[in-house]
Amino acid sequence: MDFYRPLLRPLLLSQLNVDPEWLTRNALGFLATLARSRSPLAANLRSYLRQTYGFQDPRLAMSLWGLTFATPVGLAAGFDKDGIAAPLWSDLGFGFAELGTVTALAQPGNPRPRLFRIPQDLAAFNRMGFNNASAEALADTLRGYFPEGQRSIPIGINLGKSKLTPLSGAVSDYVSSFRSLRSLGDYFVVNVSSPNTPGLRSLQAVTELEPILAALQAENTEQRPLLLKIAPDLVDEEVVAIAHLAQRQQLAGIIATNTTIDKSLLSVEHLPGRREPLATEAGGISGAPLRSRSTEVIRLLHRTTQGQLPIIGVGGIFSAEDAWQKIVAGASLVQVYTGWVYEGPLLVKTIQQGLLERLDSAGLPNLAAAVGSAAIDS
């Protein structure tokens, strides 16, 4: 039985003055307690989660970068920043989980309130600012959870720049985080696309980005898959330039996309509980308003690289159809966060069941055969 939709979702969508960050922090805290506990009750609860939310079919399995993804649906970065619930994500049906964003220096993030739900648009608005306990703290957490290095699903780690580090020191800042964590993650993501760290998006310019990627690859002696997460607000020419740079630097893939700063996508004039005009609010939008543009970027990346650069698609996935559209546009894997919060934990299982139905309808043998099948030029 799923308790989320009848009990927790109404609270999320209500007009009560409930801080979304408080809800998220407490939900994550419960999962972290469950992950740490060795009690029989915790074991029974985890077994219940696996039975309720788990779903696997070999036709959905994907192999990338020497890793096996039993299911193509992963948890996007931003929810479990410090990895405190890392062992639990497989219990909830995810095929992989991306932790972070973490930075070299611990930082509190931006002032509260900094996370808002906008139910009428099925959206979230955040200006969290990479609040995290530091890359070294995440390393300690992962060593504690996985002392032998064995994880039930691939774990990705999303790396950002510390707010106190000037843009001129970005290279050493990213390298410092990577050094702390490089043996503890299955893949790594360079995040230069959050709108909530001053100047960060300027690092998406090829001339700024290339030294960062080159330094990380030089440090990448264990040959961990290194990916880049990009913004949906780039113009197509910038997306193409980044795709070529990614290939030149032999990146493992691209994650498309991060949040958007295009406030015209929202129907509201003010954020919940705020009087300031929306146009003056700093932050990024995730959820349904991002769906179309993120899929467009995926399609453009797939065409530009002729399908040679794996893509993880994220942005506005609330259903199997949303995930399918990103896959046929060129995504090999997909991630959820905002849609997962709105729809509940069963979303992951529902997506997988729906993907199988679409494979059958299309007469395709497996999900790999669907990747990019609708990305051809019209």
From Swiss-Prot:
Localization, per the record, is: Cell membrane
Membrane-topology descriptor: Peripheral membrane protein
Q: Which residues does the record give as substrate binding sites? A: K81, N126, R127, M128, G129, F130, N191, N196, N258, T259
Catalysed reactions listed for this entry: (S)-dihydroorotate + a quinone = orotate + a quinol
EC main class here is oxidoreductase
Q: Which GO MF terms are attached to this record?
A: dihydroorotate dehydrogenase (quinone) activity
Q: Which cofactor does it need?
A: FMN
Q: Does the keyword Cell membrane apply?
A: yes
Identify which residues the record assigns to the active site.
S194 (nucleophile)
Q: What does this protein's record comment on cofactor binding?
A: Binds 1 FMN per subunit.
Membership in a protein family: Belongs to the dihydroorotate dehydrogenase family. Type 2 subfamily.
Under what name is this protein listed? Dihydroorotate dehydrogenase (quinone)
The gene name reads pyrD
